[in-house]
């Protein structure tokens, strides 16, 4: 058996023990906004199993970087871009991070609307140019990549005029479902929401996966409990939830 799986199982077993239950922790968790659906389902399961309590805070990359250096926390499940910031990385314990999940990009339309062609770079370009309006979250790691794709397609300036910027991932699908924007352009798991349908993923030449990593904070008040939650995110139960939410585990 894989040694990492054995270690994860042992850590989780300790967290589930009567001794651990008697010393239940309250963990402050910082997480990428695009992990909201997955962690809101997995969090209560972990709490029920271990007795620990999770205080989940979801935010985009710029806000997460600020949060890591402004207040105590116990662990993060964050876009890897957060770890590229030296000040933010220094707030996490030394040692390897774990790859929790990854997700690609796509385009969504309102449910029932005709799905445009996004299968090739040129098709995606023409679809974006023809759209009356688009929406995404510019101030995020995922949004930064969307902007790069616009520039690669040579339509960066054209997109500025028709973009309706959102401040949280969940608002993207809501705007499309309400008819406030014709297209949603973002991570595919965020676009899997009521009232919207995925027109398709970005074509292979433009596709990239945003990786979410997990790590315990250097100042965690209960590092073993924090590590137990990260280990829980690698279990078959968690893997099943991630897949159901449109996220690729690991």
Describe each PLM feature range.
Residues 22-89, 93-250:
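Exported/periplasmic ABC-transporter solute-binding proteins
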Residues 7-18:
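Bacterial N-terminal signal peptides
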Residues 1-7:
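Positively charged n-region of N-terminal signal peptides that target proteins for export
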């Amino acid at each position: 058996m894989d040694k990492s799986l054995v270690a994860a199982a042992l850590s989780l077993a300790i967290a589930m023990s009567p001794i651990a239950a008697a010393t239940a922790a309250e963990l402050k968790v910082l997480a990428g906004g695009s992990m909201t659906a997955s962690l809101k389902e997995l969090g209560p399961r972990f709490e029920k199993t271990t007795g620990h309590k999770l205080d989940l805070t979801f935010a985009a990359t710029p806000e997460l970087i600020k949060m890591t250096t402004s207040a105590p926390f116990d662990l993060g499940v964050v876009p890897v871009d957060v770890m590229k910031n030296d000040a933010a990385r220094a707030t996490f314990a030394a040692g390897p991070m774990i790859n929790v999940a990854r997700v690609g990009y796509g385009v969504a339309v309102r449910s029932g609307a005709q799905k445009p062609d996004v299968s090739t770079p040129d098709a995606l370009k023409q679809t974006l140019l023809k759209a009356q309006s688009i929406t995404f979250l510019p101030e995020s790691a995922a949004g930064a990549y969307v902007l790069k794709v616009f520039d690669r397609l040579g339509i960066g300036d054209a997109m500025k005029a028709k973009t309706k910027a959102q401040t949280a991932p969940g608002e993207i699908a809501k705007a499309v479902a309400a008819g406030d924007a014709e297209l949603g352009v973002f991570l595919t798991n965020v676009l899997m929401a009521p009232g919207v349908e995925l027109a398709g993923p970005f074509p292979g030449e433009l596709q990239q996966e945003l990786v979410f990593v997990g790590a315990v904070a250097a100042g965690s008040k209960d590092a073993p409990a924090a590590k137990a939650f990260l280990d829980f995110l690698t279990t078959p139960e968690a893997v099943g939830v991630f897949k159901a939410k449109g996220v690729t585990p690991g």
